[in-house]
Amino acid sequence: MQYKINMYAIVVYDVNVSRQNQIREFLRKYLYHVQRSVFEGEISPSSLYYMKKILQSYIGETDSLIIYVLRDKSCLMDKIVLGEDKDLQIY
């Protein structure tokens, strides 16, 4: 029997405007777009590894991209939204 082990990832980025669309379109293949520069969702370890490799090739010297990895979405203690809630029914 094969078990599916997924993690939960939150990706935030601050990149040059010339790379924003490229990064956004790539991340949409793996995660949910929840804010302008924020994506989150479940992801397999192999997809996370591949995603990191590709994103590394997109990032410039002055860009910043952070990936928070949780064991699973139950490890997220709370989600506090101030302003418009753009929740995509992922919880």
From Swiss-Prot:
GO biological process, one term: defense response to virus
Single Gene Ontology MF annotation: RNA endonuclease activity
Annotated binding of Mg(2+), by residue: 14
Needed co-factor(s): Mg(2+)
Pfam families to which the protein is assigned, alphabetical: CRISPR_Cas2 (PF09827)
UniProt signal peptide: none
Enzyme class: hydrolase
CDD domains linked: Cas2_I_II_III
EC nos: 3.1.-.-
Keywords from the named record: Antiviral defense, Endonuclease, Hydrolase, Magnesium, Metal-binding, Nuclease
Function, in words: CRISPR (clustered regularly interspaced short palindromic repeat), is an adaptive immune system that provides protection against mobile genetic elements (viruses, transposable elements and conjugative plasmids). CRISPR clusters contain sequences complementary to antecedent mobile elements and target invading nucleic acids. CRISPR clusters are transcribed and processed into CRISPR RNA (crRNA). Functions as a ssRNA-specific endoribonuclease. Involved in the integration of spacer DNA into the CRISPR cassette.
Assigned protein family: Belongs to the CRISPR-associated endoribonuclease Cas2 protein family.
Quaternary structure (record): Homodimer, forms a heterotetramer with a Cas1 homodimer.
Protein name: CRISPR-associated endoribonuclease Cas2
Organism: Nanoarchaeum equitans (strain Kin4-M)
